[in-house]
Each structure stands twice: as C-alpha cells, then as structure tokens.
Regions:
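Peripheral interaction segments used for macromolecular assembly
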Residues: 1-208
Length: 208
C-alpha cells in the first residue's frame, strides 16, 4: 500500500530526449521537472485514487500555471524518492482523464474534509489514505482532529468500504465507524505500555 501523504511534496519528472550532441547516444533520455505532488484526486464514489494534482513552477517566477493531473498508474518512484512519468502519451491531464474514463467534475479531494457518520456524528477530518499501487483502490482513510490532538489520541482508520459518499462538504461514513478504536496516538501507546507493565507486574507478583 502507498500512503498519499508520503507522496505529497515529491518532485515529478517527465522523460525528454536529450539534445543531439556529437558522440551522444541517439536514444539517451533526460528528465525534465514537471512540478510537485500536492493533492490526491479520488473517484466519484470516493473509494479509488484516480491520480494526483501536481503544482507546476511559475513562469519566470511570477505567472502561475494551472496544476497538472498525473494518473495513478502513470508514474514510478525512483531511487531518490522522486516520481517519473511512465506513460508519456496518456498519463497526464486530459489524455489521462479520457483514458481512465473519469467524470472529472464529480471526482473528490478528501484531504482536509470533515468526516461524519450517516447519523451525523463528527469524527474529525480526513488526514491521509492508503491505496493499492496496482489497482488504485483505497484500503483505508485516516480521520482525526489534527495537530496536537491527533498526536495524543491518534486517528480513526476507516476502511474504504465504510465510505458512503460525499454530502455538503463532508465525507459520510457508516455509523459503525464511530466504534472503531483510535490508534497511533501517544496516549494510546502510553496506555498500551501501562497495560503491558501491569500484566508483567501481575505475573511477577503471582510468581512471588
């Protein structure tokens, strides 16, 4: 599984043929910078990553350019952690959207969106998701209160199957998601450590 947060901020490069030079290999390939990954785009049902928005460098440092769209199946991760386009013909922008057959206007960007149950209970906001690099299908979404709160108490790891859809600026999930235990927070880890210490202490007392 790939984490969308792990991809954010990574530089994206596109292959380009090197200029012909005396003695150079005719098929030599160099990389040109496209930009940096800054947002994941999900399918209308919210359960599949269709690609990423890539912030492109401003022209002459002043004229802002529109984001590029990089399809989920059109890049590979290089040894240095940067991304390289692998489908030059239909891996970017309109060509990629057409190939994937996505309804662009209905696609969703979950990151930072509030999440609540179908009955209206607020769970926090969407902070991350992991997805299968071979299919684009989301495994889980991570929902928490953010900042210090998330660091202390952790996040809800909500299976994609619990996502009901989008409504009024919110991710709607199954009511059962409210019963998922928080995980990953410092308090939770401290609690686990206390529980383990308590068990060990009990065992030691029993042996004594």
């Amino acid at each position: 599984m790939l984490s969308i947060n792990d991809l954010y901020g990574r530089k994206v490069y596109v292959p380009k043929k090197a200029k012909k030079k005396k003695g150079a290999e005719p098929d030599e390939i160099k990389l040109g910078k496209l930009g940096k990954v800054h947002m994941a785009v999900f399918s209308p049902d919210g359960r599949e990553v269709v690609g990423f928005l890539v912030t492109r460098p401003d022209i002459v440092g002043m004229v802002k350019r529109p984001d590029a769209f990089l399809a989920w199946d059109s890049f590979r991760i290089l040894d240095d952690g940067t991304l390289c386009l692998t489908r030059e013909g239909d891996g970017l922008d309109d060509a990629a959207r057409k190939r994937l057959g996505v309804d662009w206007d209905s696609c969703v960007m979950w990151e930072g969106m509030d999440a609540k149950t179908a009955s209206g209970k607020k769970l926090g906001y969407v902070s991350n998701a992991d997805f299968d690099a071979k299919t684009g299908l989301v495994g889980s979404f991570y929902v928490g209160d953010g900042g210090v709160a998330r660091a202390l108490v952790g996040t809800f790891q909500i299976p994609a199957s619990m996502v009901k859809g989008y409504s009024n600026g919110c991710m709607i999930v199954d009511d059962a998601a409210a019963n998922i235990e928080l995980g990953g927070g410092a308090a939770a880890k401290a609690g686990e450590g206390f529980a383990k210490a308590k068990v060990k202490g009990s065992e030691a007392a029993h042996k004594a």
